[in-house]
Amino acid sequence: METIKRLIWPKKEIFVGDFAIGVNRTVPVDVFQLVCRVVLRYMRTGKIECESDSLSKFVVELLKTDCAAKWEWFMKRRQGGDYIVPLSIATIPLMPLLSCTTSVRAVSVGVLGCGFSSNIPIPRLSVPRKGLLLRLAAGLALAPICALAVYATLPREKLSVYKLRTEARTHMEDEKEATDCLVVESARELKGKDGEDLLTGSRMTKVVASTGRRRRTPYAAKVAQVARAKVGYLRNTPENRLIYQRVIIEIMDKDCVRYVDRDVILPMAIGCCFVYQDGVEESAALWGSQDSLGVKXGGLVRLPGVVTQINRDIPSDVLLPQEVLEVRTGPPIAKDRNIFMVAGCPSQARFLVHNHCLKNLKRGLVERVFCVEKDGKLTRTPQPTKGSFGRLSPFRKAVCEKVGVAHRLGYDGFLSYYSGAKLRTYTRAVESLHITPVSERDSHLTTFVKAEKISTSKGDPAPRVIQPRNPRYNVELGRYLRHMESKLMKAVDDVFGETTCIKGYTADEVGAIFRRKWDRFDKPVAIGLDASRFDQHCSVEALQYEHSFYRALYPGNKLLSKLLEWQLHNKGKGYVPDGTITYKKEGCRMSGDINTSLGNYLLMCAMVHGYMRHLGINEFSLANCGDDCVLIIERRNLKRVQGTLPGYFLNLGYTMKVESPVFQLEEVEFCQAHPVQFQGGWKMVRNVRTAMSKDVHCVNNIRDLATRRAWSNAQHHGGLALSAGIPVVERFYSRFPLYDMPVKHQRIDTVTNVHKWRGSGGNYHVTPESRASFWAAFGLTGDEQVALEDRLDRWEMDLFGREGVDAHEPSILDSAVA
């Protein structure tokens, strides 16, 4: 190296007068550093630290890292278009061996008795024998050059990114955590009071500049101050330390703090969060006091049903010629419903129930069956473009091939799937079918207003209606489909390559499914797909596509085809005390159909599968619960999905809204529940505000004491099965008193609804990790969770006293941010 320097930069003597006083050499240049920088520039690696003391070691280490980065890209992130250029270059050595010859082919055409002929040259590749050795030598000469070019064009990420990712894996327990944190961001400098550099660099690039310990302390105090401003003053408890830790990590992410500095700053910043200024502790003692008014009252309150104040007619241009809606007004007879509520719960949300009357039934049919609202006006639902569902046929073919040919159930086999009141209803239908076969009249709809809990915050929404067909029709169609539902959903899962149809799983199992889905991706992002009134948007074409699944399982079955055809042309009547409504509707999913759930699963899965194939995106995960879906993708594909998904579904006749993306697992909302970590793993937990307000309301008539006991027992056992080990929610359901089981009767079968309370339960305790995860899901800090649990401990239910008055005491749930 010194010899090279002397040749390039010779010594120059400095003379003063006639005497030489020294030797001057230009500023020395480190050739090693120069070569490193040139190589790095050529290799597009960014800045990395030089840890080798010789050029040969550096080059060897660089090649190893380069090979490893390209191999990782091929194994984990490859896409079809990444390797077009390398494969094209690899074919260059074969070109000298090939020769293109042209052969002439005579083509004759006869038109109206006249013949025309012409010669068409046709190119053809061949390997001529003449000059083969020369061509082979040229190909061999090009081979090493092309091999180097192929290697140079193989895709990979920047070597600095790969090196940091590798180092992060060695120092962090969770490899996914190291991958998630590495996001490309520009470098940033933080200046001190005197203009000095506090932190230099970014999360993606390491630089030689370092930060001394005395520089880190002021930044830790500053981060702690910002964290307290975000979540407030919290007590020094394990769960609150975890909450502060999460907030501080987010702040350091935005500030691009290096990992080596984070390791020192994080514990100091967490400690600074609990160091308060003078007077803060005295003030916190006031607002943090748990000595509030006792909540003794928990009596039962009866709230009357409501009637909608909106009366709208169907515009003349909406109905098809074969569609009808006739309203006949009867005597003003009213049969009001009631909703019962337990007073004293720490939530101000209130719910009401719609009465079963003519005004509610008419508005429900007009706005939830016939019309949708667009720009303040009623209009017909959007219709699919011609051939749009035909493009989804590959999905149907793949699913049906996995299921194979099915066989129809006997009557006894169909009845074995039911128990209780539904078994008695279907048994009578089977006895009737032995006498008279099924007919078109059995497919007619009986319509009534659904008794559901309506939040008062929604104003005056359109009532929901239920439209069941005759049990005789359900029995005949159920013999074809009831036993095939699980097989079809399993086949859909196989086509997607993972669990996709979320049905029949416990809350713990669904939480574990979402954890596995989330861990599949390097940088996951979840978006909710909100299908506005999915059943109403099911057009005739959509229903025909769904029916094609069933016809493929029973090829040539005429009775099944007839039963399915009756679903395309619906006739129904609605009887209420003050009138009747008769209607005919083409298409539209009827909420009482036996294949409603299965059909919605198949339609939504098929449309999402077709959409992702349309985009050419293979890395995605779908969680489907009928019309409620969550799509998990890589962050780099987010903008493509957000920009094109609504238009694609509109071509299929569905109004689909893409909800705001979430980048943390606890923020994912699926069926009004969030994944929350607890002692046993992950569990889907209902929104705490919805659970604590909705579940103290009951739309069933619980005036008799036996039904009240059954309802309280069902809330206690079912709620704990769904929320064992979860903060706040477990304490809430434990407050429902347990009573001796009453004598079993039909009403209690309706109230208990055992199938709705599937959960693992278990003896789990609330841990600091579960409190931190609960905070990430619902925005309630550890202190707020403890305060709510203390409030619930003082809440006593009295279900057998006289009816009380609705009263509300303010709580944390009223002002906490969801």
Curated annotation (Swiss-Prot):
Catalytic activity: RNA(n) + a ribonucleoside 5'-triphosphate = RNA(n+1) + diphosphate
One annotated GO biological process: viral RNA genome replication
The entry's keywords: Nucleotide-binding, Nucleotidyltransferase, RNA suppression of termination, RNA-directed RNA polymerase, Transferase, Viral RNA replication
Keyword Nucleotidyltransferase assigned: yes
More info: Readthrough of the terminator UAG occurs at position 297.
Family recorded in the similarity comment: Belongs to the tombusviridae RNA polymerase family.
Protein name per its UniProtKB record: RNA-directed RNA polymerase
Organism: Cymbidium ringspot virus (CymRSV)
